[in-house]
From Swiss-Prot:
Protein name stated in the entry: Nitrogenase-stabilizing/protective protein NifW
Organism: Rippkaea orientalis (strain PCC 8801 / RF-1) (Cyanothece sp. (strain PCC 8801))
Function according to Swiss-Prot or TrEMBL: May protect the nitrogenase Fe-Mo protein from oxidative damage.
A Pfam family of this chain: NifW
Similarity comment: family membership: Belongs to the NifW family.
Organism classification: Bacteria, Bacillati, Cyanobacteriota, Cyanophyceae, Oscillatoriophycideae
Keywords for the protein's UniProt record, in alphabetical order: Nitrogen fixation
One GO process term, biological-process aspect: nitrogen fixation
Length: 110
């Protein structure tokens, strides 16, 4: 539980490790170093959803939901790769200025 924590304290956090410590979530530092941006991006998306779905909950309830969201974001990358989740724009758009071998074969009529 995060009852002793305040929403003001939460808003001052910046690092993945700070969020994990704030919510008393056990974590592997090496895993976080490798997946930091993806965990934080997923966490950001999940807290946006919490704020949208539960706009009128107390700060304590909101922090509890945020704790669950961070746990979910952290656990997601234990079973999925960043490439599979495609959180960032670079993974969502097809690369530009690339000629695929299949396209060359089709054009050549081979």
């Amino acid at each position: 539980m995060v009852a002793e924590k305040t929403f003001t304290e939460f808003t001052k956090l910046t690092d993945a490790e700070d969020f994990l410590k704030f919510f008393n979530i056990d974590y592997d530092a090496t895993f976080v170093n490798v997946n930091r941006l993806h965990i934080l991006k997923q966490f950001s998306l999940l807290i946006q959803e919490v704020d949208k779905v539960f706009p009128d909950v107390s700060e304590t309830e909101k922090l509890e939901k945020y704790q669950l969201a961070l746990t979910e974001a952290y656990e997601l990358f234990k079973t999925s790769s960043p490439l599979e989740t495609k959180l960032f724009k670079v993974f969502q758009e097809p690369p530009k200025n690339i000629v695929l071998l299949d396209d060359l074969v089709k054009e050549a009529g081979v």
